């Protein structure tokens, strides 16, 4: 017996605003059922001595230490601005 129905597939497609045909719904139902069957096989694995992880790969931060440094002087930055006003970049208005 299938663990997921064609109606459920059509409902999810409708929620995602996807237009699918009856043939596609049947195909997706079979594919999703196969995925669920495979996932259920994972429940049979003995994980007693396996430590819990949040990632498959050993994840660690490889970034450098964040060290604040002084930025460029305002005058030097603004000399590249096509337009400025009161020490700020002036950009075209986008709201009325």
UniProtKB/Swiss-Prot annotation:
<dbReference type="GO" id="GO:0005524">
    <property type="term" value="F:ATP binding"/>
</dbReference>
<dbReference type="Pfam" id="PF02686">
    <property type="entry name" value="GatC"/>
</dbReference>
<keyword id="KW-0067">ATP-binding</keyword>
<keyword id="KW-0436">Ligase</keyword>
<keyword id="KW-0547">Nucleotide-binding</keyword>
<dbReference type="GO" id="GO:0006412">
    <property type="term" value="P:translation"/>
</dbReference>
<protein>
    <recommendedName>
        <fullName>Aspartyl/glutamyl-tRNA(Asn/Gln) amidotransferase subunit C</fullName>
        <ecNumber>6.3.5.-</ecNumber>
    </recommendedName>
</protein>
<dbReference type="GO" id="GO:0050567">
    <property type="term" value="F:glutaminyl-tRNA synthase (glutamine-hydrolyzing) activity"/>
</dbReference>
<dbReference type="GO" id="GO:0070681">
    <property type="term" value="P:glutaminyl-tRNAGln biosynthesis via transamidation"/>
</dbReference>
<comment type="subunit">
    <text>Heterotrimer of A, B and C subunits.</text>
</comment>
<comment type="similarity">
    <text>Belongs to the GatC family.</text>
</comment>
<comment type="function">
    <text>Allows the formation of correctly charged Asn-tRNA(Asn) or Gln-tRNA(Gln) through the transamidation of misacylated Asp-tRNA(Asn) or Glu-tRNA(Gln) in organisms which lack either or both of asparaginyl-tRNA or glutaminyl-tRNA synthetases. The reaction takes place in the presence of glutamine and ATP through an activated phospho-Asp-tRNA(Asn) or phospho-Glu-tRNA(Gln).</text>
</comment>
<dbReference type="InterPro" id="IPR003837">
    <property type="entry name" value="GatC"/>
</dbReference>
<dbReference type="GO" id="GO:0006450">
    <property type="term" value="P:regulation of translational fidelity"/>
</dbReference>
<dbReference type="GO" id="GO:0050566">
    <property type="term" value="F:asparaginyl-tRNA synthase (glutamine-hydrolyzing) activity"/>
</dbReference>
<dbReference type="InterPro" id="IPR036113">
    <property type="entry name" value="Asp/Glu-ADT_sf_sub_c"/>
</dbReference>
<keyword id="KW-0648">Protein biosynthesis</keyword>
């Amino acid at each position: 017996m299938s663990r997921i129905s064609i109606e459920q597939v059509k409902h999810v497609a409708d929620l995602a605003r996807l237009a699918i045909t009856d043939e596609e719904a049947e195909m997706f139902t079979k594919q999703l059922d196969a995925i669920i069957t495979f996932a259920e096989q994972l429940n049979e694995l003995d994980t007693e001595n396996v430590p819990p992880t949040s990632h498959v790969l050993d994840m660690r931060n490889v970034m450098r230490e964040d060290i604040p440094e002084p930025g460029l002087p305002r005058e030097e930055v603004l000399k590249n601005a096509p337009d400025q006003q009161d020490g700020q970049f002036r950009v075209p208005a986008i709201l009325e």
